[in-house]
Amino acid sequence: MQFSLALVTLLATAVSALPTEEKRQAYIPCSGLYGTSQCCATDVLGVADLDCGNPPSTPANATDFSAVCSAIGQRARCCVLPILDQGILCNTPTGVQD
């Protein structure tokens, strides 16, 4: 009886000493219909954005997405359909301040 109590106590101590694993979700700036992340220079009434391209690096969060695009003189956008460096139907990603 005492042996089993000692064994349970030992196992409980060992389990409580194990570090917890923290899993973080990857940042996905654009999803759904507006699923293409772009850095665009000019916004035309929210219908089209001019001089758009893919972000030069993968953003880690909304602030980083804005900073990555700002570093090349553009703004972070989520577009429906980028065609020939033009973003069609673009909006500002969640968490990004214009």
Curated annotation (Swiss-Prot):
Source organism per UniProt: Gibberella moniliformis
UniProt cross-references to SUPFAM superfamilies, sorted A to Z: Hydrophobin II, HfbII
Effect of a null allele: Does not affect pathogenicity in a corn seedling infection assay nor the production of microconidia.
Cited Pfam families: Hydrophobin_2
Function in brief: Aerial growth, conidiation, and dispersal of filamentous fungi in the environment rely upon a capability of their secreting small amphipathic proteins called hydrophobins (HPBs) with low sequence identity. Class I can self-assemble into an outermost layer of rodlet bundles on aerial cell surfaces, conferring cellular hydrophobicity that supports fungal growth, development and dispersal; whereas Class II form highly ordered films at water-air interfaces through intermolecular interactions but contribute nothing to the rodlet structure.
Signal peptide: 1-17
Domain of life: Eukaryota
InterPro entries per record: Cerato-ulmin_hydrophobin (IPR010636), Hydrophobin_sf (IPR036686)
Family, per entry: Belongs to the cerato-ulmin hydrophobin family.
Protein name per the record: Class II hydrophobin 5
Location in or out of the cell: Secreted; Secreted, Cell wall
GO cellular component annotations of the record: extracellular region
Gene expressing this chain: HYD5
Record's keyword terms, sorted: Cell wall, Disulfide bond, Secreted, Signal
Cysteine pairings via disulfide bonds: C30-C78, C39-C69, C40-C52, C79-C90
